[in-house]
Each structure stands twice: as C-alpha cells, then as structure tokens.
Swiss-Prot record:
Family the UniProt entry places it in: Belongs to the PsbN family.
Subcellular locations according to the entry: Cellular thylakoid membrane
Cellular component terms per the entry's GO annotation: plasma membrane-derived thylakoid membrane
Organism: Synechococcus sp. (strain CC9311)
Record lineage: Bacteria, Bacillati, Cyanobacteriota, Cyanophyceae, Synechococcales
NADP keyword on record: no
InterPro entries per UniProt: PSII_PsbN
Record-annotated membrane-spanning stretches: 10-30
A Pfam cross-reference name: PsbN
Topological category with respect to the lipid bilayer: Single-pass membrane protein
Keyword GTP-binding: no
Principal subcellular localisation of the protein: membrane
Gene transcribed to yield this protein: psbN
Record's function text: May play a role in photosystem I and II biogenesis.
One example of a Gene Ontology biological process annotation: photosynthesis
Designated name of the protein: Protein PsbN
Length: 46
C-alpha cells in the first residue's frame, strides 16, 4: 500500500478536531452539563 500524503494526514487531523469540538459543544449544550448553564434572559427581568 502506498503511504498517504502529508496533505491527507493534515486534512484528516483537522476534520477529527472539528468533529471533536462540535461533539463537545453539543454535549455541553444539551447533555448533563447543560444543567449548570445560566440563561441571561431569565436573570434580567424587565
């Protein structure tokens, strides 16, 4: 098998990092850690 090019390795690394950050953001927004998030609109009654 031919060794992969450096560009393909970098592209896969960037894609993995973006998918990881997206997954972490969704988990933080909708998973169990979301119970600790504050809603700024509820904090300021008009």
């Amino acid at each position: 098998m031919e060794s992969s090019s450096p560009a393909m390795s970098v592209a896969i690394a960037v894609l993995a990092a973006l998918l990881g950050l997206t997954g972490f953001g969704v988990y933080t927004a909708f998973g169990p850690p979301s119970k600790n998030l504050d809603d700024p609109f509820d904090d300021h009654e008009d």
